[in-house]
């Protein structure tokens, strides 16, 4: 078996491709179930954000598993496989492990060191467990990646002062307008990204902010976090009226369909000189045809790269420090992974010794007769079990801890031969991975 990741990111695909492959949380159960139905995929975890979509798998046969996974991605996105392949990356075992560690630490993000990705990795792990996608291997991998992400943020300064997608969008708006306090702002959406938009807009001097959301209650919950700010709250029913009065529009919702297009915006902007729209959603909330309107200047997440680049250079040295920590985490995971090949031998040895213990205990108790107290039987049961555990403990620990692959395999072969165990198939199977 092998660990693999197949996916795309802001580095390999533009937003119009990424949005077609987006797998939001509300459809992950369906996607996970479909992937688990393929014969060569044992475990599955789907990480889907505005800047990446990656599927982590444990495959019985690597080539067959990759083929099944890429075919699924083509069908899901409705992009022909030949066209999709140019945007996909495929990483196997140690490379896949290191990739998830880097993602979790924020080293593969558009915004180097950003903190949101760690929460997204945690959510991926949680849902992969909930929907029976992750098994023992991906569970261990994601736990270690989450731990690595926390460690990098604790032991380095990579997360200090890091810009986010939201702050980069606000920075771009300030560059384009110079004075945010003189402009009326509308934010469509009331989730985490919108909360960050409000935070950064207020810090840059914006003071005329309206929040539009399907649920007014959710908008109120967002406003409660900014008690001193005069935020205007509206439902989407008021969208046309609010946008008519807005100079800057930010969109950040989980909608899979565009909320704004040319037909909606044309009557809104017909009597003004310009309107700027900053769409930080994937899939995009703003249709590309709005650019046909001369008054509209629309920006999406891919347009933020220039802003982010200004923040990156000072963080590269911190990233190098983080990489060395991640190498330790990868090595730790690899030791655990390699120890898995000892499981069939250890399991067979324990089963055989336990069977002998039970047989000999039964003989001894039958000789002692029925008058032998039950309490005494429990004592003898515990005694024999303790002896077995003590005898097996050191050999099992030493076998698992042996990092020299050939030495470990020779030890397993010796145990199989000496105790006449039936774990040879398991050893052979691990040798082929």
From Swiss-Prot:
Domain comment in the entry: Possesses an unusual extended V-shaped dimeric structure with each monomer consisting of three distinct domains arranged along a curved 'spinal' alpha-helix. The N-terminal catalytic domain specifically recognizes the glutamate moiety of the substrate. The second domain is the NADPH-binding domain, and the third C-terminal domain is responsible for dimerization.
Assembly and binders? Homodimer.
| Keyword Oxidoreductase among record annotations | yes
Query: Pathway, per Swiss-Prot/TrEMBL?
Result: Porphyrin-containing compound metabolism; protoporphyrin-IX biosynthesis; 5-aminolevulinate from L-glutamyl-tRNA(Glu): step 1/2; Porphyrin-containing compound metabolism; chlorophyll biosynthesis
Q: Which family does it belong to?
A: Belongs to the glutamyl-tRNA reductase family.
The UniProt site entry described as Important for activity is assigned to: 99
Q: Where along this sequence does the record place binding of NADP(+)?
A: 189-194
- Enumerate the Gene Ontology biological process terms: chlorophyll biosynthetic process; protoporphyrinogen IX biosynthetic process
Mind listing the UniProt keywords for this protein, alphabetically? Chlorophyll biosynthesis, NADP, Oxidoreductase, Porphyrin biosynthesis
Please name the Gene3D superfamilies in this protein's record. Answer: Glutamyl-tRNA reductase, N-terminal domain, NAD(P)-binding Rossmann-like Domain
Q: Is Transit peptide among this UniProt entry's keywords?
A: no
The protein here is known as: Glutamyl-tRNA reductase
User: Which reactions is this enzyme annotated as catalysing?
Assistant: (S)-4-amino-5-oxopentanoate + tRNA(Glu) + NADP(+) = L-glutamyl-tRNA(Glu) + NADPH + H(+)
UniProt miscellaneous comment: During catalysis, the active site Cys acts as a nucleophile attacking the alpha-carbonyl group of tRNA-bound glutamate with the formation of a thioester intermediate between enzyme and glutamate, and the concomitant release of tRNA(Glu). The thioester intermediate is finally reduced by direct hydride transfer from NADPH, to form the product GSA.
Binding, substrate: 49-52, 109, 114-116, 120
SUPFAM superfamilies given for it?
A: Glutamyl tRNA-reductase catalytic, N-terminal domain, Glutamyl tRNA-reductase dimerization domain, NAD(P)-binding Rossmann-fold domains
Instruction: Name the Pfam families for this protein.
Output: GlutR_dimer (PF00745), GlutR_N (PF05201), Shikimate_DH (PF01488)
Q: What is its EC number?
A: 1.2.1.70
Question: What function does this protein fulfil?
Answer: Catalyzes the NADPH-dependent reduction of glutamyl-tRNA(Glu) to glutamate 1-semialdehyde (GSA).
The active site of this protein is located at 50
